[in-house]
Amino acid sequence: MRYRFPDNFWWGSACSALQTEGDSLNGGKSQTTWDVWFERQPGRFHQGIGPAETSTLYRHWKQDIALLKQLKHNSFRTSLSWARLIPDGVGEVNPQAVSFYNHVIDELLAQGITPFITLFHFDMPMVMQEKGGWENRDVVEAFGRYAQTCFTLFGDRVKHWFTFNEPIVPVEGGYLYDFHYPNVVDFKRAATVAYHTVLAHSTAVRAWRAGRYDGEIGVVLNLTPSYPRSQHPADVQAAHHADLLFNRSFLDPVLKGEYPADLVALLKTYDQLPACQPGDRQLITDGKIDLLGINYYQPRRVKCRDTAVNPQAPFMPEWLFDYYDMPGRKMNPYRGWEIYAPGIYDIITNLRDNYGNPRCFISENGIGVENEQRFVQAGQIHDDYRIDFISEHLKWLHKGISEGCHCLGYHMWTFIDNWSWLNGYKNRYGFVQLDLATQTRTVKKSGEWFAATAEHNGFD
């Protein structure tokens, strides 16, 4: 076999609570920011589809876990819903939620599938957002209590915990670029939200370590390598600034226990530093992780700015760089993202060379395609493009592992076609096709290919 992976390699996929569970307003669950935003502005959501039903995992969990086993998963990552487990954000636990999550965890283990559990995947309870969300340190403390509750309830069986999934995304979406609630454009508030998210992460890590639970705790970051247009110093500096803002603002605190000095100096120059309090530095140091999840979809290509900044305009990341459309790059036209498989190699070798080669795994990697019904043959979607996408990324991952990178697994996004926030079900990502009208599940060709790859621990 040409591409054989290490023994005990994690083969699986990932999803999140809000994107798959459905029953968003049932079972004792309170509203998240997404439920409220959809109520207020349904026209912003593709085809007017909100989070109420999604992929109905809440009702079909046993069937779906059987499909995971059929797809030869030995591991699977999903998230818990804070709004479902503790509807008021703090205080009483919802027994219906405890029962549901116990069923899911126990069934995964019964089928030989290791659960990887994320505490927060973009789904802020509205009662917490009304207090200011991550702008309010009271919400940081509440998250720590929520995390402790999760560890107490499920820590006897869950051995792989992740505090956040892609914590930079709610910062970008909610406070810079208007694709998450609360739809604010304000860099200073964005910096505060990012900083408090790191504090929330560290608070949860402290709680986990204090409980002396068996297993490991980490975080899932979407890492987008920043490539300069050229080696001209101005382009290189532009890429460095993009890397500081979008990658190292979370990567350095969770792996090194501190922020990059360059990032602190940069934010200070533009008067964008968040307010710090005594004890924050030690808290951040205490938030260093055991395991890093890496979500990789696309690179970020940048260049120095072609024009001067308008000094009257609000400060934004783009004051520091312009995006660069590299000629000839391979694109996914449905998502508008570049497909660049070597990026996965560059990420893990950077971790090896500059971050002490931490334990890590690919926690998401995938391709969303619109109107996959075009590719149905004999009742099955023949998504050869997804097989090609996965295999190319796995080849580069294999190369990094063979060169000493401590990468322990590969999880695809995603198991079943799911609800993708504002995009609804526009682009499909799953190994399993979901018919929205009937909720029928049908394994795609890529699912069969992945099952064979996982079973043989590699491919030719």
Regions found by a protein language model. Give the residues of each.
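Active-site region of glycoside hydrolase catalytic domains
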Residues: 1-45, 88-90, 98-460
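Generic alpha-helix structural propensity
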Residues: 56-63, 71, 80, 96-103, ...
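Catalytic domains of carbohydrate-active enzymes, especially glycoside hydrolases
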Residues: 60-81, 286-291, 354
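Aromatic- and Gly/Pro-rich amphipathic surface segment
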Residues: 31-66
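A short acidic, glycine/proline-enriched capping/turn motif at secondary-structure boundaries
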Residues: 74, 83-85, 122-124
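Glycine-rich, proline-tolerant flexible connector loops at the mouths of alpha/beta enzymes
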Residues: 80-93
